[in-house]
Each structure stands twice: as structure tokens, then as C-alpha cells.
Amino acid sequence: MTAKPLRTVLSLLFFALSGVLGTPEISCRNEYGEAVDWFIFYKLPKRTSKASEEAGLQYLYLDSTRQTWNKSLYLINSTRSALGRTLQHLYDTHNSTNDTAYLIYNDGVPGSVNYSRQYGHAKGLLVWNRTQGFWLIHSVPKFPPVHGYEYPTSGRRYGQTGICITFGYSQFEEIDFQLLVLQPNIYSCFIPSTFHWKLIYMPRMCANSSSLKIPVRYLAELHSAQGLNFVHFAKSSFYTDDIFTGWIAQKLKTHLLAQTWQKKKQELPSNCSLPYHVYNIKSIGVTSKSYFSSRQDHSKWCVSIKGSANRWTCIGDLNRSLHQALRGGGFICTKNHYIYQAFHKLYLRYGFCK
């Protein structure tokens, strides 16, 4: 038996045993169903007009056990994809006892034709219990559905990114405040009353409370279940500057290359007006023969420019545009070497300041 089939059999055996021995721990999962501390996906844009089962559904994958991007084993709309495996925790909560919480937010709700501009542009999902859980931050509109895994057909055309991080329970007290600042459009949630004495804001947001005072912005230090350090930048609609130029670059003390959706007549130009500059990425290369324009890419990430003393990578849910400077949203950043190298080698060209 080859390594890949053997690994698949072992992962299936693990889940079979978990049904007997107890519920598997809530964590990010790889394509074999194995728990990982974190993973990142980069869904590639649809680059052909021809009908194809795979077009717009392939993705690059990186996790805490790897050192570089890998082509996914499955398409992103498969329940065997890393997202499909991980989100099974969400769908299992519908059949569990009241010991698991979840919260889903997106300004584009699955099945709706409208977008909620009164809320933040934030997109994400949390599932957790009193031991640990995960936070998925992503750029995909109308995702995920509440009752079963599907990837939206509207998400095939453009590139998309997301990061899943496994956190111990204590970190959800920090995330609780970050969610308040983001002003998320929560379209499904369940938080058992046993969580309420530790979590102040998420239960009230889940109950659609209108009496919450929203801070302008907040920076939180977070630590994954296995100890990887992150910082999370959360801004509300009351912070009306470009989050990249006005805050992230200056706080991290690094020049940034930023990839966000470059929609015509809405993008902000590269900015060198402050001590630390932000340059718009113009094209991305997966291989020497496979590349695409940032206009085909709905992903949102930035990375320190080559030669920087501080080598940061950030992934989030806001574009560099005038409209989104007025929306809530955020970015989670890390100095992990392998994440930095993986993203830094993707950019092909960026725009200089005028």
C-alpha cells in the first residue's frame, strides 16, 4: 500500500474510533482530516472561459506541518478539502449537546443577492468549546452555508484566501473583543449560556443587541494552540483611514506589498506619504508559466517587502479602496518564516508611488 492510501485509511480509522471514544477535538483540519495548528488556502481564479469541472476550484495549501505551498489534493468544493474537513465541526454542532459554540459572519449571506453595507466587510467563522476551537478568517462572499458544506458558485471566478487557526479556549476571550470592533454581519450563531460569563460581547452580538458601544480600532496579541504568535488588527467604520497605510505598516514598522481586489476606479494607489510605505501588487505568479492579474484576485493579504528587518505576513478581509476605508474589517499577522516565504514568492510585479 502506498503512502497516500495508507494515510487516508488511517485518517478514516481515526474518525471511526472518535465516534466510539468521544468527539474529536475542535481544530483546523488538513485534507486527511488530521488536526493542524493552522492552515492557509489560496483559491486560484478561474482563468478560462471553457466549461471545466476544476476551473476556479483549485487551491494552494499550506499548514503548520509544511514549509511551502502544495497543490490541493481535492477541489475546494469537496467535503474532503481542508475547508470541508474543518467545517464539519460546524455541521456536527447541530447534532451535539449544548457544549459547543459557533458564530458565522459575512456581509454577503449565502442565498442572498444583496450585501449588508451597514456592517463590516469582515468574513469568518468560529467554532469552539471549553477546551479549544478555531477561527477561520477569509475573503469569500456568501460562505459558508449553515447546514452543510458547499462552496458558492459565485466564488469560482476570482482568487480567494483564508487562514484557519486553532486556539485554546482562553484566546476566545481576546477574540470576543476583536469581533465587536469588526462590526460583523452575523447570520448564524449559537453560544451556550455556560460561555456567557467569560465572553462579554459575542453572546450579545449573537442576540442582536443594539446597545453595544463600538470602539474605533483595537490590536490584540493572540497565540495559537501550539504557540505560534499572531497580532490581529480590527477596525470599525469609525476608523476611516486605509488600514494598510495608516495602521498596519506603521505599527509593524515595515514597507508592505499589498494584494487586494483592484476594482476599477475604486482602488487606492500605492502610498509613500508615511514612514512605512504600501505598494499595490499588480500580478501574482503561481509558477513560471501560471500567473494572473490582481484584478482577477479577490484575496486580501500583504507581506513585508524584500530586505525588511521585520518580515510580516497578514491575511484578512478588507480591500485598499475608498469605500472600504469606511467599513469594519481586519487582518491577522504573523512573522512565521514559512508563511512569509510562501507569500513573498507569489508576487511578480507591484506599483510604485507617483
Swiss-Prot record:
Signal peptide boundaries: 1-22
Enzyme Commission number(s): 3.1.22.1
Keyword DNA-binding attributed: no
Free-text tissue specificity from the UniProt record: Highly expressed in the eye lens. Detected in liver, but not in the other tissues tested.
Entry keyword set: Endonuclease, Glycoprotein, Hydrolase, Lysosome, Nuclease, Signal
Residues of this chain annotated as glycosylated in UniProt: N70, N77, N95, N98, N114, N129, N208, N271, N319
Keyword Nucleotide-binding: no
GO cellular component: cytoplasm; extracellular region; lysosome
Major subcellular site: other
Cellular localization per UniProt: Lysosome
GO molecular function terms noted in the UniProt entry: deoxyribonuclease II activity; DNA endonuclease activity
Catalysed transformations (reactions): Endonucleolytic cleavage to nucleoside 3'-phosphates and 3'-phosphooligonucleotide end-products
Note: Inhibited by aurintricarboxylic acid and Zn(2+).
Function: Hydrolyzes DNA under acidic conditions. Does not require divalent cations for activity. Participates in the degradation of nuclear DNA during lens cell differentiation.
Similarity comment: family membership: Belongs to the DNase II family.
Name of this protein: Deoxyribonuclease-2-beta
Species whose genome carries this gene: Mus musculus (Mouse)
